[in-house]
């Protein structure tokens, strides 16, 4: 994550004092303004299974599908995040600075996950079970990734804010914090959430497509060939 604005939005009181002494402003700030607080929540919203769309419809729903492949099943969701910022501010006219005790609340979630299995596959059949099992791997990747993002973001927040007030030129503290969140934290968290797509792509490997084409005594392959003929 880009470390922006730190030259202006100071994260340590040492900029205002000698190595081992607090200035009166530092003492007043640190003793009275309150604690810096960061809070993070992460949750998934569950999943559902949809068996109403054909493999051709699912293929159209998925971008960048190889021309010779059909999408037999599809797992869809959307990463969501929100960051709320509030702050207590204490000014010091003598120095022309202010100290800020931010409260940062981060919420991470996925939209309800929908697992699609092509309507050509009847529930209870071997082919349906194989396609569903493949999609459940995608579901697991999403559900396993969210706690990892939570852990990484929580550690980064703790390191950045360290339960210490921040210092800035008078009247600029909150605006600088908002800028840091918008240009630093939001892209950082978005990337962390988006890293799961590399895992999803690895699940849809050529080897996995080849395996699925051979399962259930060729039942899946016969459906694929039928749809290829219909497309031509």
Regions found by a protein language model. Name each.
Residues 1-4:
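Positively charged n-region of N-terminal signal peptides that target proteins for export
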Residues 6-15:
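Bacterial N-terminal signal peptides
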Residues 17-21:
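Boundary at the C-terminal end of the N-terminal hydrophobic targeting segment
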Residues 23-34, 38-44:
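N-terminal membrane-targeting hydrophobic helices
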Residues 37-39, 43-45, 49-107, 113-119, ...:
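Metalloprotease/metallohydrolase-associated module, dominated by Zn2+-dependent proteases
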Residues 109-122, 126, 147-150:
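Sequence context surrounding c-type heme c attachment/ligation sites in exported
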Residues 125-130, 139:
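Active-site alpha-helix of zinc metalloproteases
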Residues 136-153:
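Catalytic Zn2+-binding segment of zinc metalloproteases
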């Amino acid at each position: 994550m880009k470390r922006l604005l730190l030259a202006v939005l100071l994260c340590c009181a040492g900029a205002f004092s000698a190595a081992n002494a607090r200035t009166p402003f530092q003492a007043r700030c640190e003793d009275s303004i309150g604690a810096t607080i960061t809070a993070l929540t992460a949750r998934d919203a569950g999943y559902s299974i949809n068996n109403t769309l054909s493999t051709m419809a699912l293929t159209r729903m998925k971008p960048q599908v190889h021309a010779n492949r059909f999408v037999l099943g599809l797992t869809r969701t959307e990463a969501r995040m929100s960051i709320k910022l509030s702050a207590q501010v204490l000014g010091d006219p003598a120095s022309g600075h202010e100290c800020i005790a931010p409260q940062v609340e981060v919420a991470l979630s996925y939209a309800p996950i929908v697992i699609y299995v092509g309507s050509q596959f009847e529930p209870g059949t071997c082919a349906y079970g194989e396609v569903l099992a493949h999609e459940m791997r995608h579901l697991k990747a999403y559900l396993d990734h969210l706690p990892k993002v939570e852990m990484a973001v929580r550690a980064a927040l703790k390191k950045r804010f360290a339960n210490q007030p921040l210092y800035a030129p008078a009247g600029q503290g909150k605006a600088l914090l908002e800028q840091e969140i918008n240009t630093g934290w939001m892209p950082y968290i978005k990337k962390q959430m988006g890293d799961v797509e590399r895992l999803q792509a690895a699940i849809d490997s050529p080897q996995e497509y080849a395996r699925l084409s051979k399962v259930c005594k060729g039942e899946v392959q016969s459906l694929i060939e039928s749809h290829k003929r219909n497309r031509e």
